[in-house]
Amino acid sequence: MQLTSFTDYGLRALIYMASLPGGKMTSISEVTEVYGVSRNHMVKIINQLSRAGLVMAVRGKNGGIRLGKPAETIRIGDVVRELEPLTLVNCSHEFCHITPACRLKQVLQQAVQNFLQELDQYTLADMVKENPPLYKLLLVE
């Protein structure tokens, strides 16, 4: 299973925010500069993460973005569930005439559940704690 760029960049943005010391605020512009992605694309991602409570966005002169809750409580599986369309195949009568007898959909759904259960074992904090090479790459001190 390959994650969409939307989910990939969402995870990257969260990793960047989790890497900042003491819940420091950052900006969408800073995140897009670090990863070299489109600002418009990142705005959509941050908006969805904000609606999900994973990012807190503060408007105004001293505004910015930061994690909406502690990194220790943000499970990677939950982020993927929030950002990723998890339907692997389109099983409807109009697209496939074997849908009533097909068992593939159940197998694929179970595979997705197993994938998410594995991701649920890790938090955002697990991705960033005691990771000096990451801090160096992100230019976070």
Curated annotation (Swiss-Prot):
Question: Could you tell me which residue ranges the HTH rrf2-type domain spans?
Answer: 2-129
Give the transmembrane ranges: none
The terms under GO molecular function for this entry are: 2 iron, 2 sulfur cluster binding; DNA-binding transcription factor activity; double-stranded DNA binding; iron ion binding
Cofactors: [2Fe-2S] cluster
Q: Could you tell me what this protein does?
A: Nitric oxide-sensitive repressor of genes involved in protecting the cell against nitrosative stress. May require iron for activity.
> Which residues of the sequence carry a binding annotation for [2Fe-2S] cluster?
91, 96, 102
Q: Which GO terms describe its cellular component?
A: cytosol
The name of this protein is HTH-type transcriptional repressor NsrR
HAMAP family per the UniProt record, alphabetical: HTH_type_NsrR (MF_01177)
Q: Which UniProt keywords apply?
A: 2Fe-2S, DNA-binding, Iron, Iron-sulfur, Metal-binding, Repressor, Transcription, Transcription regulation
Matching entries from SUPFAM superfamilies are given as: Winged helix' DNA-binding domain
Record InterPro entries: TR_Rrf2-type_CS (IPR030489), Tscrpt_reg_Rrf2 (IPR000944), Tscrpt_rep_HTH_NsrR (IPR023761), WH-like_DNA-bd_sf (IPR036388), WH_DNA-bd_sf (IPR036390)
Q: Which PANTHER family match?
A: HTH-TYPE TRANSCRIPTIONAL REPRESSOR NSRR, WINGED HELIX-TURN-HELIX TRANSCRIPTIONAL REGULATOR, RRF2 FAMILY
Species of the source: Pectobacterium carotovorum subsp. carotovorum (strain PC1)
Task: Please list the residue ranges the record marks as binding DNA.
Answer: 28-51
A Gene Ontology annotation in the biological process aspect, one of them, is: negative regulation of DNA-templated transcription
The record ties this protein, via NCBIfam families, to: PRK11014.1, rrf2_super
Q: Which Pfam families does the protein's record reference? A: Rrf2 (PF02082)
Co-factor binding comment: Binds 1 [2Fe-2S] cluster per subunit.
